[in-house]
Amino acid sequence: MAYKHILIAVDLSPESKVLVEKAVSMARPYNAKVSLIHVDVNYSDLYTGLIDVNLGDMQKRISEETHHALTELSTNAGYPITETLSGSGDLGQVLVDAIKKYDMDLVVCGHHQDFWSKLMSSARQLINTVHVDMLIVPLRDEEE
């Protein structure tokens, strides 16, 4: 099956480039579109009451770092990146919204094979939310 628009969900870890390479290798033979998305935790939702942190400054800095990392992934993809998206909130809902808006038909995401990922897997959440084809790529941390 030839996909028309592949969405790569990245967490901006060093392993994200593995996902980009995998998606590009699938897109190239069919001249499919490729887009990147990163979904950030909305830190203001994690805190209740008063805190001694300037969330506005912290979120601005995180947004700048995210933009820089996405730009670097896009530039080094070796293939045209159609959309570079960044969102915050519920991972599944943000992806569903992007899929509908940009008519995407495949989501490529990674799954870190570590202790914490066994407890709280983003991939498992997406399987129950996203209604297009998915490719889940097992990732190993670079130290291993």
Swiss-Prot record:
<dbReference type="InterPro" id="IPR014729">
    <property type="entry name" value="Rossmann-like_a/b/a_fold"/>
</dbReference>
<keyword id="KW-0963">Cytoplasm</keyword>
<dbReference type="Pfam" id="PF00582">
    <property type="entry name" value="Usp"/>
</dbReference>
<comment type="similarity">
    <text>Belongs to the universal stress protein A family.</text>
</comment>
<dbReference type="GO" id="GO:0006950">
    <property type="term" value="P:response to stress"/>
</dbReference>
<protein>
    <recommendedName>
        <fullName>Universal stress protein A</fullName>
    </recommendedName>
</protein>
<keyword id="KW-0597">Phosphoprotein</keyword>
<dbReference type="InterPro" id="IPR006016">
    <property type="entry name" value="UspA"/>
</dbReference>
<dbReference type="GO" id="GO:0042803">
    <property type="term" value="F:protein homodimerization activity"/>
</dbReference>
<dbReference type="GO" id="GO:0016020">
    <property type="term" value="C:membrane"/>
</dbReference>
<dbReference type="GO" id="GO:0005737">
    <property type="term" value="C:cytoplasm"/>
</dbReference>
<comment type="subunit">
    <text>Homodimer.</text>
</comment>
<dbReference type="GO" id="GO:0042802">
    <property type="term" value="F:identical protein binding"/>
</dbReference>
<comment type="function">
    <text>Required for resistance to DNA-damaging agents.</text>
</comment>
<dbReference type="InterPro" id="IPR006015">
    <property type="entry name" value="Universal_stress_UspA"/>
</dbReference>
